[in-house]
Amino acid sequence: PPPHPPSSAASDVYKRQAGKNAIGRVDLVENRFIGIKSRGVYETPGGTLLMHAHRAIESVTLDKDTMHKKEQAMPRYAELIYNGYWFSKERFKLQRIVDLKRKKVNGSVKLRLYKGNIIIHSRITKSPAYSMKKVSFEENKTFNKSNVERFINYHKKKLK
């Protein structure tokens, strides 16, 4: 898989295919920075495909805590950019975090497009955090079922 976004020619193909399948169009009312609401209709079929593909690879390469921290940081990151704070110290700090996390995210994704839906067909990566062998309870030698009670008791304390 390429280490950079696809070429312009490939991007045009993605945009056309996504557009034919009604992907990437959003109609929304936004809360503007200056305190008013405005309606916008945006069409980004190629960008929507790239976002779904990137998230599909993130889901198998990033661990739980990293994913959680990323999901918490991204709304703030987007808000800073939307409000014109591209050169702010806060945006630079968030960018450093994003860049560190992104080093683990690599691979390729096959997507199927059908009537407005993006279906993940396959994901391949050289640095998976996910392993089918580790999550199989039937044949898993690393998962000891007798530890379940201790695990539950430990986490139950958080509820008291």
Which residues does each predicted region cover?
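Peripheral terminal appendages
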Residues: 18-160
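Active-site loops and adjacent core secondary-structure elements that bind or stabilize anionic groups
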Residues: 13
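Single conserved hydrophobic/aromatic residue that forms the stacking wall/gate
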Residues: 1-10
